Amino acid sequence: NPSSRFDLRLEPTRRFIEQPFSNHNGGHLAFGPDGYLYIGLGDGGSGNDPDHLAQTPAELLGKMLRIDVNVPNEDASGYRIPPDNPFLGGNSARDEIWAFGLRNPWRYTFDDVTRGGTGAMVIGDVGQNRFEEINYEPRGRSGRNYGWRNREGAHDNVTNRPLAYGPPTDPIFDYGRSDGVSVTGGFIYRGTRLGAAHRGRYFFADYSGRVWSL
């Protein structure tokens, strides 16, 4: 936002989330059309989420978080919980959680409402070794469980421990390792130069170099 101003003299507020392994960090932040900050976190790393963190309500890893960072400078926490977060005030799940069951969300986008979009969120979630997936979340549809580690794509994976809650929400699209190796989420096209046939389509890529649209 070109009108934003930052005061570098302010003491930075830091929040740390312990990562048990070095991979699956998520690594993406995005503001939604509601003005809240969405934070996609991976499951903490290693293979097949050995501690089942993406399905553990008391853990932030393997989740999509949603927070309000529009707080006064003197607010020591640095953020607040939006009043309509789905698990706010619950007995077990963390208040910051918006959705469960992500392995390594890389990356996600919101359908731009200023250009005729719906405000929906689309998430590219990197798979373990069989399937890459694209998850679609209509605007405001909170509290979903995208299934990892019990599900990889729309397929059963490691099921010896239960989902935090169900039923899981399957992806709108998944693909196997014969087509790619690691999804990179993209954007819903709302421009005009590519023609009307491409408007509203979701463009995404894979580490192998391929680009698709849905």
Question: Can you say where each PLM-predicted feature lies in the sequence?
Answer:
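Asp-box/WD-like beta-propeller blade repeats and closely related beta-sheet repeat scaffolds
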Residues: 1-30
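Loop/turn elements at helix/coil->beta-strand transitions in domains of secreted/extracellular proteins
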Residues: 13, 34-37, 117-119, 200
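Aromatic- and glycine-enriched pocket-lining scaffold segments that form the walls
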Residues: 25-44, 62-63
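Beta-propeller domain segments
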Residues: 43-214
